[in-house]
């Protein structure tokens, strides 16, 4: 879909600028629910549904070693991955229904600084 159909919020524009500082590029035009970011072999998804509520949330690949993430305060790290359609570079499996869906770890960041630390830890 074209970018004008799903314009970025001010917060999302700031998040993409920080991602760019860490070498991440926008892989394709933003869609309704996600911004797909890539650096080298690392792909993350910015959760646009949560950023609309001023929550910074990023989906990481389910094979990501979460122990590598910064131990500093500011990152909310879940116990298990979450299913969500639309993350085309992540694996799929059946959750509660009959159809497989993509899944990943939804990491929440307390602020822009913790978002930057998260991206730095992934590279």
What are these regions (language model features)?
Residues 4-26, 115-122:
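Amphipathic alpha-helical segments
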Residues 10, 29-32, 38-41, 110, ...:
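Short, well-structured alpha-helical interface segments that form or flank functional binding sites
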Residues 19, 36-37, 103-105:
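Short low-polarity hydrophobic stretches
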Residues 22-29, 81-85:
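Short linear motifs in intrinsically disordered
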Residues 27-33, 49-52, 96-99:
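Short, ordered beta-strand-loop transition motifs
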Residues 34-91:
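Short, conserved beta-strand/beta-arch hydrophobic-aromatic motifs that form part
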Residues 84-123:
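Well-ordered alpha/beta subsegment
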């Amino acid at each position: 879909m074209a970018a004008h159909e799903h314009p970025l919020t001010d917060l999302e524009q700031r998040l993409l600028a920080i991602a760019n500082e860490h070498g991440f590029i926008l892989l394709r035009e933003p869609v309704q629910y996600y911004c797909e970011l890539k650096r080298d072999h690392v792909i993350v998804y910015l959760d646009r549904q949560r950023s609309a509520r001023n929550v910074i949330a990023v989906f990481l690949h389910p094979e990501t070693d979460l122990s590598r993430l910064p131990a500093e305060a500011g990152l909310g790290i879940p116990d298990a991955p979450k299913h969500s359609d639309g993350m085309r570079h992540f694996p799929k499996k059946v959750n509660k229904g009959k159809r497989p869906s993509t899944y990943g770890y939804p990491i929440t960041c307390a602020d822009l600084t913790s978002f930057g630390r998260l991206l730095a830890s992934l590279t």
